[in-house]
């Protein structure tokens, strides 16, 4: 389906949304539509490449002006949606943009749950540029955690404090941690404290946003995951009114050296407002396969039904948007 047609459908769905929310939503829908035929084919690079192509094509026709702060890599490594690439047809560069055309490429390639397409934006100069660091230690929860949890505290202390703040038994606290060797000791500590570990193997943006969303079934996200994904998450958490802290966590001597040369303070505890400041924040997450926040694509009668979560500080509350496009 032509981008203009998708854009018109989305405009009808979110007629009250100011620029550039609809354009960003059109971009994730385009990424999902463009890559859907490859989902489940076992080739994660093919799925991701198709999503990148479609998202970039959609954004190139957008009326706003933005710059990619969190993208697919450096210009010589990523020919499209690279860090520093200018987006849209606007006369001025008014927006920082973070893109992840497919978060969970392995999941999409396998056709298993949890793959999404994500884009986020904030006013120019407000989004932390951390592209030189791959990993970040993160703590994400709802507003109930504000003034209660601290990323420097032990997992046991945080789990017990959150149980008290939520007024529930610690055995009811559900903590998401990505299933990687670097987090195995943390996972063991969480379980020994009596909380429930929610396992996931890839795609920490959706799980982190779920942790900041009341009623999602996830109370807290802890552990080391992607640093760029942490900044994307922060945009959503700002809109949701949640709580988040992060510490950059390079894992190899080369990563540490690169981070230091780039001027990052590796001992700095980033509060939510350090990760993304400003007043206007937009976050869009569109389902590829079924996930914790949105359903995956449904194909029937030559049409794709695509579901998205839209968060915009200029709108009231989260919006669940569903559109149909030609398969």
Predicted regions and their residues:
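Acidic beta-strand-loop-alpha-helix segment within the catalytic core
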Residues: 118, 123-200, 262, 279, ...
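General beta-strand structural signal in soluble alpha/beta enzymes
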Residues: 68-72, 97-99, 108-110, 129-130, ...
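Oxyanion/phosphate-interacting regions
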Residues: 10-13, 20, 210-228, 232-327
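Short acidic, glycine/serine/threonine-rich loops at helix termini
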Residues: 80-82, 110-112, 131-133, 185-191, ...
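A contiguous, surface-oriented mixed alpha/beta subdomain in the mid-to-C-terminal portion of proteins
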Residues: 180-183, 191-223, 227-231
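DPxDG-like acidic metal-binding loop motif
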Residues: 92-103, 107-128
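Solvent-exposed alpha-helices and their adjacent loops that cap or buttress functional pockets
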Residues: 60-61, 86-92, 100, 108-112, ...
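N-terminal subdomain of lithium-sensitive/metallo-dependent phosphomonoesterases centered on the IMPase/IPPase/PAP
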Residues: 4-98, 160, 164, 205-206, ...
């Amino acid at each position: 389906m032509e981008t203009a047609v998708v854009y018109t459908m989305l405009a009808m769905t979110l007629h009250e949304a100011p620029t550039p929310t609809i354009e960003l939503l059109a971009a994730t829908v385009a990424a999902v539509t463009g890559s859907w035929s490859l989902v489940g084919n076992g080739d994660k690079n093919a799925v991701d490449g198709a999503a990148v192509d479609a998202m970039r094509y959609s954004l190139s026709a957008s009326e706003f002006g933005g710059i990619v702060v969190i993208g697919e890599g450096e210009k010589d490594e990523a020919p499209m949606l690279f860090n520093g690439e200018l987006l849209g047809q606007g006369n001025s560069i008014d927006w920082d943009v973070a893109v992840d055309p497919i978060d969970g490429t392995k999941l999409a390639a396998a056709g298993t749950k949890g793959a999404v397409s994500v884009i986020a934006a904030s006013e120019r100069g407000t989004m932390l540029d951390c592209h030189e660091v791959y990993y970040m230690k993160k703590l994400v929860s709802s507003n109930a955690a504000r003034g209660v949890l601290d990323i420097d505290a032990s997992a046991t202390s945080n789990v017990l404090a959150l149980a008290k703040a939520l007024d529930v038994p610690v055995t009811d606290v559900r903590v998401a941690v990505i299933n990687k060797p670097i987090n195995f000791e943390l996972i063991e500590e969480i379980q020994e404290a009596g909380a429930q570990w929610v396992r996931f193997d890839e795609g920490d943006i959706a799980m982190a946003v779920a942790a900041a969303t009341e009623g999602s079934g996830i109370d807290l996200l802890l552990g080391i995951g992607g640093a760029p994904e942490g900044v994307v998450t922060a945009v959503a958490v700002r809109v949701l009114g949640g709580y988040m802290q992060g510490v950059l966590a390079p894992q190899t001597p080369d990563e540490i050296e690169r981070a230091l040369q780039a001027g990052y303070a590796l001992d700095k505890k980033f509060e939510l407002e350090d990760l993304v400041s400003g007043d206007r924040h937009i976050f869009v997450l569109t389902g590829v396969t079924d996930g914790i926040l949105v359903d995956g694509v449904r194909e029937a009668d030559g049409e794709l039904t695509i579901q998205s979560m839209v968060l915009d500080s200029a709108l009231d509350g989260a919006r669940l948007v569903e559109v149909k496009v030609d398969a």
